[in-house]
């Protein structure tokens, strides 16, 4: 069997990759030392990768193959992972490839809405030129509409926002439309209802779910590997593991300011072209914060994220 076929990786479990060709059966594939990749660094294969594979004889009911080439990725979602033999080092891990948009699942409560997490994703999405859809789940717990206070700043930034309830179905059809004909990477902290929402959207119980831990108030992780699912009516979703440390690859103390888009119109007025918008005299961004033209919480978020970046 020397012919090669093309397909998309829909699941990654360890060193095993499930590839789908469209109309054909799923194929269980592995890589070999001669596998060629057009992507430098990070892991060789990720969910969403387009690959060429060579079928091989199988002793099981499921077809098997060998991946011979991984095509260049249009976009990636990454996180950092520790290199076990030397925990002082980290390596980038691609957990989703060739995505059209990032869908950040948050919740009104249990766990509470986390604006700092939203800001990290906004920075990443801006840096990767990817749209971010902010989904707020569990709005059935928000009888007084309190979440709108948290969302006002993001609405003012023209962010895409969808309010849903996996419990009573509110907003699910609107969310379907926002996902139609796109490859969307679902991400977010555990406990926000990500797996429950995917099960609703896909129309079958594909993923395990878990409630928030009563002891810690934090979610219990149920996703341990990435997987891609087709949506009825068009589109695909990639379920990604809970990201404990979202990787802002390429974001530095020098360029972070460019990804807080509300800063951009004030930056040319700063006294110094290299202004970090922290302590410099004549900073137009700080003046805009003081006058209320830039949201103070967003500015504090910028300072916190700036401090977390390597020198």
From Swiss-Prot:
Keyword Methyltransferase (UniProt): no
Binding locations of GTP: 137-140, 188-196
Domain CP-type G: 88-246
SUPFAM superfamilies attached to this UniProt entry: P-loop containing nucleoside triphosphate hydrolases
A GO MF label: GTPase activity
Keywords: Cytoplasm, GTP-binding, Hydrolase, Metal-binding, Nucleotide-binding, Ribosome biogenesis, RNA-binding, rRNA-binding, Zinc
Annotated EC: 3.6.1.-
Obligatory cofactor(s): Zn(2+)
One GO CC term, this protein: cytoplasm
GO BP terms in the entry: ribosomal small subunit biogenesis
Domain of life: Bacteria
Keyword DNA-binding applies: no
Location of the protein in the cell: Cytoplasm
Group of enzyme by EC: hydrolase
Alphabetized InterPro entries for the sequence: G_CP_dom (IPR030378), NA-bd_OB-fold (IPR012340), P-loop_NTPase (IPR027417), Ribosome_biogen_GTPase_RsgA (IPR004881), RsgA_GTPase_dom (IPR010914)
Main location: cytoplasm
Cofactor: binding details: Binds 1 zinc ion per subunit.
UniProt binding sites for Zn(2+): 270, 275, 277, 283
Record PANTHER family: SMALL RIBOSOMAL SUBUNIT BIOGENESIS GTPASE RSGA, SMALL RIBOSOMAL SUBUNIT BIOGENESIS GTPASE RSGA 1, MITOCHONDRIAL-RELATED
NCBIfam families: ribosome small subunit-dependent GTPase A (TIGR00157)
Entry-linked HAMAP family: GTPase_RsgA
Protein family membership: Belongs to the TRAFAC class YlqF/YawG GTPase family. RsgA subfamily.
Functional note: One of several proteins that assist in the late maturation steps of the functional core of the 30S ribosomal subunit. Helps release RbfA from mature subunits. May play a role in the assembly of ribosomal proteins into the subunit. Circularly permuted GTPase that catalyzes slow GTP hydrolysis, GTPase activity is stimulated by the 30S ribosomal subunit.
Record text on subunit structure and interactions: Monomer. Associates with 30S ribosomal subunit, binds 16S rRNA.
Protein name, entry field: Small ribosomal subunit biogenesis GTPase RsgA
Gene: rsgA
């Amino acid at each position: 069997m020397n012919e090669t076929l093309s397909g998309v990786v829909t699941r990654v479990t360890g060193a095993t990759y499930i590839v789908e060709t469209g109309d054909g059966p799923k194929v269980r594939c592995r890589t070999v030392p001669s596998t060629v990749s057009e992507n430098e660094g990070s892991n060789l294969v990720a969910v969403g990768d387009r690959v060429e594979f060579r079928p091989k004889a199988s002793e099981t009911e499921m077809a098997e193959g060998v991946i011979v080439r991984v095509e260049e990725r249009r976009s990636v979602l990454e996180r950092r992972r520790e290199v076990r033999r030397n925990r002082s080092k980290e390596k980038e891990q691609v957990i989703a490839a060739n995505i059209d948009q990032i869908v950040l699942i948050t919740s009104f409560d249990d766990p509470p809405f986390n604006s700092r997490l939203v800001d990290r994703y906004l920075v990443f999405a801006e840096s990767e030129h990817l749209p971010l859809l902010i989904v707020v789940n569990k709005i059935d717990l928000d009888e007084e509409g309190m979440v709108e206070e948290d969302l006002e700043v993001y609405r003012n930034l023209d962010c895409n926002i969808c309010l849903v309830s996996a419990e009573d179905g509110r907003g699910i059809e609107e969310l379907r439309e926002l996902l139609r004909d796109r490859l969307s990477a679902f991400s977010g902290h555990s406990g926000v209802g990500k797996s429950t929402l995917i099960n609703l959207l896909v129309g079958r119980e594909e993923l395990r779910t878990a409630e928030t831990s009563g002891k810690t108030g934090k979610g219990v992780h149920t996703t341990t590997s990435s997987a891609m699912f087709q949506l009825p009516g068009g589109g695909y979703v990639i379920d990604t593991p809970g990201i404990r440390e979202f990787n802002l690859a390429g974001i530095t103390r020098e360029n972070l300011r460019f990804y807080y888009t509300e800063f951009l119109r004030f930056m040319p007025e700063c006294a110094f072209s290299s202004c970090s918008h922290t302590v410099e005299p004549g900073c137009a961004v700080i003046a805009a914060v003081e006058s209320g033209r830039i949201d103070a919480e967003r500015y504090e978020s910028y300072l916190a994220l700036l401090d977390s970046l390597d020198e």
